[in-house]
Amino acid sequence: MSRMSGVNRLPVEKYSCPNCETGLDDDQVRHSWRCPECNDYVHVWAHDPDTDTKITLIRKRGDEIEEGDLIHLPGQLTKDCYWVLGTSQVKDKVGIGLKGYGQFKVLPDEPVNCRIGGG
């Protein structure tokens, strides 16, 4: 099993590629979170009926996180997201500097939920 398939999720999720304008299913995207046709990031529309949280995400590897991304910490998809101020190599991990939080460390191939919009 790919580490990317172990990402935190919300109960209702729909997947699409903005470039190919194609709906995708979980089996097509869960191991890379990229479109199988064009390799662009898959957009994830996610909904939590219990909290009525509706968000749009992309899922990146830890080593793909960039300054300016908005990320959700593990288990916090229904809570605040944090602005990425920068990244650095910290031994075998990626250190992600987050505004209002401090540094959060992930493995290079660890999945990170990046918010790109509301629901």
Question: What kind of region is each of these model predictions?
Answer:
Residues M1-V12, D92-K93, G100, K105, ...:
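A broadly conserved sequence feature marking short terminus-proximal activation segments
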Residues P18, L77, E110:
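A broadly conserved detector of short glycine/acidic/proline-rich loop/turn motifs that flank catalytic sites
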Residues M1-T56:
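N-terminal cysteine/histidine-rich coordination modules
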Residues W45-F104:
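Long, charge-rich boundary regions
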Residues C35, L73, L107-E110:
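Intrinsic-disorder/low-complexity coil detector
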